[in-house]
Amino acid sequence: VLQACPDTIFLGHAPGFWIHISGDDLSLKDTYPEANAPVLPGGRIPELLRKYPNLYCDISAGSGRLALSRDLDFTRKFLIEFHDRILYARDYFDNKHQELLNSLSLPVPVLEDIYFRNAERLLAE
């Protein structure tokens, strides 16, 4: 679908999407990995983001935070590489996502893209 509809923006969201941040055995999809599980090479999300500029990631759900909390070194690199296609949102009233993002010592322009510039850009289109 990403290839067939290059002018359509797709937002990846929820456990069925975020499980693919890592190259883990797909049998793990029934038991979402806990935090501190290393992200293994071969994840579909980074692969698809590199190939399809119309794919964006929505980190609003707990699954987004869990995926990003697994391996903080990987997450910092991932967010810097794809900062122009990560969307911050929340569907719960806590600060865990902000605490995670703010703990990674990301450059201010990266945080601004994630927190609001990407959404502004998409909504303006």
Question: At which residue positions do the language-model features occur?
Answer:
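Mid-to-C-terminal alpha-helical segments outside catalytic/metal-binding sites
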Residues: 81-87, 92-125
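Catalytic pocket-lining loop regions of alpha/beta-barrel enzymes
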Residues: 1-87
